[in-house]
Curated annotation (Swiss-Prot):
Species annotation: Shewanella halifaxensis (strain HAW-EB4)
InterPro entries found in the cross-reference section: Aldolase_TIM, His_biosynth, HisA_bact_arch, Isoase_HisA-like, Isoase_HisA-like_bact, RibuloseP-bd_barrel
Name this polypeptide is given: 1-(5-phosphoribosyl)-5-[(5-phosphoribosylamino)methylideneamino] imidazole-4-carboxamide isomerase
PANTHER family per UniProt: 1-(5-PHOSPHORIBOSYL)-5-[(5-PHOSPHORIBOSYLAMINO)METHYLIDENEAMINO] IMIDAZOLE-4-CARBOXAMIDE ISOMERASE (PTHR43090:SF2)
Domain of life, source organism: Bacteria
Gene Ontology MF terms: 1-(5-phosphoribosyl)-5-[(5-phosphoribosylamino)methylideneamino]imidazole-4-carboxamide isomerase activity
Family according to the record: Belongs to the HisA/HisF family.
Active site: 7, 129
Top EC category: isomerase
SUPFAM superfamilies the record matches: Ribulose-phoshate binding barrel
Pathway membership, UniProt: Amino-acid biosynthesis; L-histidine biosynthesis; L-histidine from 5-phospho-alpha-D-ribose 1-diphosphate: step 4/9
Substrates-to-products reaction catalysed: 1-(5-phospho-beta-D-ribosyl)-5-[(5-phospho-beta-D-ribosylamino)methylideneamino]imidazole-4-carboxamide = 5-[(5-phospho-1-deoxy-D-ribulos-1-ylimino)methylamino]-1-(5-phospho-beta-D-ribosyl)imidazole-4-carboxamide
Length: 245
């Protein structure tokens, strides 16, 4: 599945390089028009990251996200600094289909597991942002990638399998926003190890060949941000490579 994505800072469409707020590119685009275009081209799921909210929870862009949800028919998943149940609940109440939770799952797994039990495994997607070290270990980063988390991807997945984890988004931080191609080896490995989880691949997608490579890796979906914004290819072309299931 092709999952077009936009990142938002203060209401503007942006891209960060490897998650670094100091390396920001701002696009002169309307978030709604951009998402409407992705919807019109056949996207079945849209992905929004609230980067302002990720950095400062008091400045969450909830009003804008609510407006986007109200003007689109396609299901939307939203991430960016979810730290409390109230924030999760607020997003679900305004019509977001699935909320992406990252750092908190590393820092407070018991709390996040209780949300899986309360809201169900369709409502939450775990975001596992990994740094792969020289030993090949997949270490999950936290806090907008500003600090290392110290837990391995596998240990977190095992922990959340106890609450029927179904959706997980995995980013190789070294590839994000770089257009260097996806880490297909990573996706092949985790899809083979945990076939019961719907894996969303993210980071580094530059060409339709990358889309095909991720599809062949066994991932269930691919999040594409920058490549679409700079018109490397269109959503329609990507879906032609990887038709919606």
């Amino acid at each position: 599945m092709i999952i077009p994505a936009i990142d938002l800072i203060d209401g503007q469409v942006v891209r960060l390089y490897q998650g670094d707020y100091e390396q920001q590119t701002t696009f002169n685009l309307s978030p709604l028009d951009q998402l409407k275009s992705y919807q019109a081209q056949g996207a079945n799921l849209l992905h929004i990251v609230d980067l302002t909210g990720a950095k400062d929870p008091t400045k969450r862009q909830t009003a804008l996200i609510s407006e986007l949800v109200n003007h689109l028919d396609t299901p939307i998943q939203v991430g960016g600094g979810i730290r409390t149940e109230a924030q999760l609940n607020e997003l679900l109440e305004i019509g977001v289909s699935r909320v992406v939770i990252g750092s908190l799952a590393v820092k407070e797994p018991e709390l996040v597991k209780s949300w899986f039990e309360k809201y169900g495994n369709e409502a939450i997607c775990l975001a596992l942002d990994v740094n792969i070290n020289e030993q090949g270990e997949k270490i999950v980063a936290v806090s907008g990638w500003q600090t290392g988390g110290g837990k391995s991807l596998e240990s977190l997945v095992e922990e959340f399998k106890t609450v029927d984890l179904k959706h997980a988004l995995v980013t190789d931080i070294s590839r994000d926003g770089t257009l260097q191609g996806a880490n297909t080896e990573l996706y092949r490995e985790i899809a083979a190890s945990y076939p019961e989880i719907q894996w969303q691949a993210s980071g580094g997608i530059a060409t339709l060949a990358d889309v095909n490579a991720v599809k062949d890796s066994g991932a269930d979906g691919i999040i594409i941000g920058k490549a679409l914004l700079i018109k490397q290819f269109s959503v329609k072309e990507a879906i032609a490579c990887w038709p919606n299931a």
